[in-house]
């Protein structure tokens, strides 16, 4: 058979689908009980989609196709997300001729150079990648209703008016507030940064450091060294301070409110703190070595402690000033021990080594399992030799900090006897109230980079608009909605629950980027994670909006909140529809149809997305639905999928390690790509794309096409007399139908592919081996029937090939709309399956014996089946599943009692092996019927139950495990 032209077949059927509009559902006379509405997070158009995206979008398409074939009226729409600063950031970097950005877009995304330079205008980026993404989705065979397509931002005014309505509703309910809050901030562009505004570091948490002001006397002036700590309770155990002698520090006037103080902090800290409600005026700049050997006063205990040198102090972390608590901090203990051995360093800074030698550790916390100094003990336990043992030190630190926080009891007045977890909060509060403590926010890692290419800082913003996800009543509604929802996989539910708990105010608007202006404060633009939470409702009316727009009959400015209120929130009302006709210029009939569509499709049945959107989009999706819509319209389910890697490596466009979705289709064909990514892992697991495996799968699909094409020539005559092997094939086909159906109902795409493709392929191979030489009506009936069912089972995965084969089979219409197969009741036959498995098992046993025993030129196999009394033993054990109960029952039989000792051994072994699943078959009959086949396959003579006991094997025979002797 010539090589299959996947591309030609795909283009043929994509054209026919679009022309016939088979994926544009009509709701007229369609029962709501049989509707199925599924959506997936619309893609962000800052570049080409890669094969990781292919997984995210193929899963819901497979499910949509499956449900459509089950007879459901399916809506699977698509739109494009262009909100936010990323696209603007790309345009800016291209304008500035940033080499990395130009390389990505020219060499990785393969944008022609003449088009690339037009990307200085962000609108051109949007147009280019929107067209490319739609082409990719069509080429992938996605069964999308394109009549509902739209894109976000004010560039598409109807959707922008919908977002305005959403925000008015949130504001009316008190869920949008103006206030002060810490946000990630691009200091160059001057805008808050949401998750989607970051090039790197979206998962990096923000830490809250307590700055404790240690006093340094410089003549008459008091200067503060604010030591940054995550453990303020340990201030009582400070023995010294650490500064990096090589780092640059500044003396600065720090003004917060009306208070002005002089601080010594790292140069980097001065910059960061200037964004956190402080005015910073640098007075002097110097190296840390200037302060080494000086003493500062602990503001809590009054103790004078020395400043010691430590190159491990990172000036770019918090203030660059670190307090040392060696009794409870492994790093501090080891650093002190190292310094005691480095007298040359101490003498360099005119420090008397005896001062360091005589530092006394201060025990603060009683911790079960440890003595006075837990950090010292943990360091010794792990065998830490010096500061170079960083991994062990990190481990020791985590162990001690966690144990002390959760189980430690504080020993120092006035907090003695209280748990450390409580004391930590009390001391932080006390420090703040006394003016000797302040808060500084810092990223846990440094790699937080905006889409503009700038390193982010944390800024305290005033007069910023927030969505108040911390509202207790709103949280309760979100919890209630989550309880009612189906979450796939169920293991993700706990993550959603945790996120609902910790979500707080989130900045919802910024000053730059594409988007919808905040309706009551248009200087602000709604950000990308805030305009993408309820657009699934907009899909339900978007085809009408698009049609009106194309006909020039829509004035977006007339799409007022009153219009959206009626469509989405109110009861049907003819009078209201007439009023809205007057106000909007849209006919009352179309307004009625819009409302009908929304009421028909909502609630959303399934929302699909990758797991990285759980902490933001998917949880915001729940919150915003419960805020705006009545309970009957709350979403019903969320399905979360895993990520993709490429040849074992994380995909990264900056490193060029990325495979564009469209390139994968060009190289392999859409059906190959679809089946491959569905077969690699269940939807919730990560997958790894490997080119060699894709090539192998392509050959298997070509074999599938070849087989069905061959079977299409057969006639499937009814009422033919079937042999047992024919019945076996139909029974196995039933199993594949059920297995595929059950798996797809739970989004278990890998299991579904195993059943629909690999299991049937393997069963068919066996059937063709077992029926070799036959060309009768029964075999033709089985193969023609199998072809009809197999093509339909595979249609959700490989729709183009299956349409082509469906046409060959003479199927009516499109296979995409054909009836999903149901198991045929009369085909079920567990006995025949057990008999066929028995034949396979015996053949495998014979081959194994020959191989293990290294028998050359084997000529005969003597097979001894179990005596009838052994069947009775096995059946009783399967029923009782207990040694005493089974023996008690068996010993009631006089004949069996004579074999008591032998039976006891058998029962003991069966229970140990948990051999409880048995189905009695006539082993000798099955073997005699399969004798010719076994002899042909194995090339040896088969002798069944001869009178002669060859090799004394006969007594070893057990039910379904015959004794075998080879000669």
From Swiss-Prot:
PROSITE patterns: AA_TRNA_LIGASE_I. Its EC number is 6.1.1.4. The keyword Ligase applies. GO terms for molecular function: aminoacyl-tRNA deacylase activity; ATP binding; leucine-tRNA ligase activity. A motif ('KMSKS' region) lies at residues 650-654. CDD domains: Anticodon_Ia_Leu_AEc (cd07959), LeuRS_core (cd00812). GO terms for cellular component: cytoplasm. Disulfide bonds: none annotated. GO terms for biological process: leucyl-tRNA aminoacylation. It comes from the Archaea. The keyword ATP-binding applies. A motif ('HIGH' region) lies at residues 43-53. It catalyses: tRNA(Leu) + L-leucine + ATP = L-leucyl-tRNA(Leu) + AMP + diphosphate. InterPro entries: aa-tRNA-synth_I_CS (IPR001412), aa-tRNA-synth_Ia (IPR002300), Leu-tRNA-lgase_arc (IPR020791), Leu-tRNA-synth_Ia_arc/euk (IPR004493), M/V/L/I-tRNA-synth_anticd-bd (IPR013155), Rossmann-like_a/b/a_fold (IPR014729), tRNAsynth_Ia_anticodon-bd (IPR009080), Val/Leu/Ile-tRNA-synth_edit (IPR009008). It is found in: Cytoplasm. ATP binds at residue 653. This is Leucine--tRNA ligase. It is an enzyme of class 6 (ligase). The gene is leuS. Belongs to the class-I aminoacyl-tRNA synthetase family. SUPFAM superfamilies: Anticodon-binding domain of a subclass of class I aminoacyl-tRNA synthetases, Nucleotidylyl transferase, ValRS/IleRS/LeuRS editing domain. Keywords: Aminoacyl-tRNA synthetase, ATP-binding, Cytoplasm, Ligase, Nucleotide-binding, Protein biosynthesis.
